C-alpha cells in the first residue's frame, strides 16, 4: 500500500476561539466540512507565543527551552536566525525525505523561509512576499528610523537625504500598486500558496508544508503606529479601534477559509485527499487587548497560545472531538506513529508554552520608551495546562500571571495541591 502523504497547514496567527467550529464569530464552512472527516482537538496549545520558536518546535518536536532557538534579552532576530541556521536538530522534513518522501514547503510568512533556515530537509521551498521592499536595504533603514512609512518619509525629509527619499518613494509606489492589485491586506498570499502547491507537488508520497498568513497583522485601514504607541505605553489604544481590528481579523479568517476550501477541492480532484494525513493548526493566536496587550509574542494568555487543531487521518478514522491536551510539539511523534501503524493520537496529559522576552528591537523613534519595554517585556514566562488547570508563571518576577481552573481565576491558597503540582510541572522547563 502507498505510504500516506503528509500535509501540515499552519494558519498563521489564527486563535482558536475566533472560529465557528469552536464557537467563535468567524464563519468558516470549509473548515467545518474538513472537520467532518477529521478529529477536532479541543485543547491544542502553541509552544510559544510567536512564529519563529513555535515553528521550530513544530518541525523538531522540542519545546523552545529544549531546542534553544528563541528570544532573550540578548538574542533578537539576527541571533535567533543564526541559531536556526546552525541547528542540527532533526526536522520532520529531514525525517520524511530520508524515507522517500518528496518534501515541499510553501510559506507566505517571510520569517519562515530559506533565509531564516526553515528550508532544511525540503527538496523545494518557496516563500511569497507581496513586497520586495521588505527584503531591500531601505527596509532596514525604515525599521531603524520609525514605526511606519509616514514616519520614515518625514525623518528622511528632515535629514535632507534626497537620494533615499527618491529611492523610498519609488519602492513605496511599487508596493502600493501591488497591494491594490492583490487586495492587500485582506489577501496576503493564500491564492499564491495554493497555486504553488498545485505546481510543486509532482510525485508520491509527498510532505507538503503550507503557511497561510492571512490572519496576521496588518489589517485594513489601520496604522501600526497606534499599536506601537500602545505597546510602548505612549498612548492606550481605544476600545473602538480594538473592536474594529478584531472585526477585520474575523474577515481575514473568513477569507482564509475560502482558500482552505480550494486547497481541499484540489486535493480531492487529484485523488490525494483520502490517503493523506492532514494536520491543520496555528503557530499562535492574536490578542486584542483582553489583558492590555495587542497582537502576539511576550505573553502566554489563552488568546495567544490556544490554537485550533484539526487532523484528518489517512484512509479514515471516525470523526470525533477530543478533549485532553495537545501541543504542536507532538506533531512529529504523531507522524512517526502514523507511518509506523501505531497509536494515532496526539493527546497528552500536559501541554506547555514558553516565552523568553521581546524578540525584536523597537524602532529608534521609541528609544525613549526602552525602559518601558524592558520593564514589561524582557521577562521569562512559562505556562502549563493539566487536569483542567492552567498556571501561567512570570519567572523573572517570581509570581503567577494567571492561575485558572477552566477559564475562571482561582487562588493558590484555596487550591494549594493543584498549584504545587503545576509548579512542579513547570520545573521541567528550564
Description of each model-found segment:
Residues 1-430:
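Catalytic domains that recognize anionic headgroups
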Amino acid at each position: 500500500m502507498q505510504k500516506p502523504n503528509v500535509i501540515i497547514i499552519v494558519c498563521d496567527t489564527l486563535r482558536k476561539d475566533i472560529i465557528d467550529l469552536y464557537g467563535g464569530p468567524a464563519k468558516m464552512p470549509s473548515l467545518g466540512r474538513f472537520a467532518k472527516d477529521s478529529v477536532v482537538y479541543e485543547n491544542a496549545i502553541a509552544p510559544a507565543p510567536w512564529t519563529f520558536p513555535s515553528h521550530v518546535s513544530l518541525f523538531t518536536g522540542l519545546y523552545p527551552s529544549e531546542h534553544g532557538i528563541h528570544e532573550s534579552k540578548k538574542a533578537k532576530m539576527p541571533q535567533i536566525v543564526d541559531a536556526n541556521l546552525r541547528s542540527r536538530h532533526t526536522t520532520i522534513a529531514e525525517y520524511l525525505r530520508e524515507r522517500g518522501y518528496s518534501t515541499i514547503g510553501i510559506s507566505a510568512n517571510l520569517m519562515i523561509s530559506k533565509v531564516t533556515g526553515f528550508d532544511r530537509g525540503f527538496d523545494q521551498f518557496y516563500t511569497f512576499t507581496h513586497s520586495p521592499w521588505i527584503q531591500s536595504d531601505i527596509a532596514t533603514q525604515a525599521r531603524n528610523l520609525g514605526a511606519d512609512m509616514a514616519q520614515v518619509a518625514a525623518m528622511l525629509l528632515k535629514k535632507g537625504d534626497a537620494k533615499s527619499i527618491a529611492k523610498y518613494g519609488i519602492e513605496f509606489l511599487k508596493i502600493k500598486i501591488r497591494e491594490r492589485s492583490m487586495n492587500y491586506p485582506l489577501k496576503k498570499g493564500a491564492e499564491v500558496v495554493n497555486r504553488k502547491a498545485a505546481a510543486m507537488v509532482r510525485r508520491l508520497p509527498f510532505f507538503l508544508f503550507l503557511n497561510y498568513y492571512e490572519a496576521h497583522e496588518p489589517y485594513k485601514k489601520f496604522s501600526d503606529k497606534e499599536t506601537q504607541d500602545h505597546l510602548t505605553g505612549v498612548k492606550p489604544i481605544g476600545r473602538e479601534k480594538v473592536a474594529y481590528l478584531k472585526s477585520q481579523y474575523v474577515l481575514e479568517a473568513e477569507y482564509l477559509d475560502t482558500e482552505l476550501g480550494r486547497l481541499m477541492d484540489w486535493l480531492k480532484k487529484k485523488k490525494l485527499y483520502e490517503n493523506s494525513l492532514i494536520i491543520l493548526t496555528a503557530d499562535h493566536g492574536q490578542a486584542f487587548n483582553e489583558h492590555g496587550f495587542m497582537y502576539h509574542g511576550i505573553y502566554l494568555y489563552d488568546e495567544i497560545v490556544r490554537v485550533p487543531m484539526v487532523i484528518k487521518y489517512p484512509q479514515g478514522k471516525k470523526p470525533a472531538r477530543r478533549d485532553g491536551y495537545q501541543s504542536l510539539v507532538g506533531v512529529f511523534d504523531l507522524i512517526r506513529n502514523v507511518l509506523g501503524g501505531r497509536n494515532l493520537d496526539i493527546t497528552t496529559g500536559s501541554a506547555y508554552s514558553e516565552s523568553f522576552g521581546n524578540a525584536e528591537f523597537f524602532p529608534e523613534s521609541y528609544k525613549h520608551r526602552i525602559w518601558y519595554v524592558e520593564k514589561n517585556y524582557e521577562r521569562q514566562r512559562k505556562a502549563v495546562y493539566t487536569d483542567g488547570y492552567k498556571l501561567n508563571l512570570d519567572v523573572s518576577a517570581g509570581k503567577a500571571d494567571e492561575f485558572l481552573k477552566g477559564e475562571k481565576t482561582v487562588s493558590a491558597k484555596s487550591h494549594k495541591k493543584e498549584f504545587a503540582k503545576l509548579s512542579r510541572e513547570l520545573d521541567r522547563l528550564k
